[in-house]
């Protein structure tokens, strides 16, 4: 179970809608992923599509909870305004907060992010904060009262995987709120590693929506997240510099004994 604030989800995979080539394909991918929570960027959402059904109506039909986000915002003020508009339009106080430093790297502006999160928490929002892989920033976000910390594995859309696994593991070991890896996942093994490092969940969009076969990739991500979660619970063996035999050498017949 993934527990965030006052909600519980069976799936540890959160899927984003960005980059999908069609709503029909997006729907197939959402179902294949098993996700129960999905993000929608308010700034680029279209109320309806050529099919006539809005993405919000589709999510309600699929019984998938909606997580509006503030993608594209560059200041705390813009992020707060976007969150407030989303709450008014969608009747939800949940929001994924993104405040981007520039359009080239899409890395978080952590100063503006902290300001936005503090204001939104004070305004009654349940805040999930997209942030860098810096453990200090993660701790400060937790101090602000966010419901979940969402460090990046690598820059958005790069598919580079987890560039700093030590920091992700450190954030997980210190956090008392859920840690959800967000951004940079390229394939299933990246999602598995995130869970093995101690993350409570994985959020991804491009890895599925821009894959050659999005539905197949969505299914692989479903299994990858579960595999990583089970591996983390099972506990890996210690890493060693030298070989350790799995079977004892005692009782082995030797050539010398046969000759004698």
Curated annotation (Swiss-Prot):
Source organism, top-level taxon: Bacteria
Active site: 96 (schiff-base intermediate with dxp)
Keyword Transmembrane applies: no
Main location: cytoplasm
Compartmental location: Cytoplasm
Xref: Gene3D superfamilies: Aldolase class I
Keyword Heme: no
GO biological process, one term: thiamine diphosphate biosynthetic process
Protein task: Catalyzes the rearrangement of 1-deoxy-D-xylulose 5-phosphate (DXP) to produce the thiazole phosphate moiety of thiamine. Sulfur is provided by the thiocarboxylate moiety of the carrier protein ThiS. In vitro, sulfur can be provided by H(2)S.
Name under which the protein is recorded: Thiazole synthase
Protein source organism: Corynebacterium glutamicum (strain ATCC 13032 / DSM 20300 / JCM 1318 / BCRC 11384 / CCUG 27702 / LMG 3730 / NBRC 12168 / NCIMB 10025 / NRRL B-2784 / 534)
Source taxonomy: Bacteria, Bacillati, Actinomycetota, Actinomycetes, Mycobacteriales
Encoding gene per record: thiG
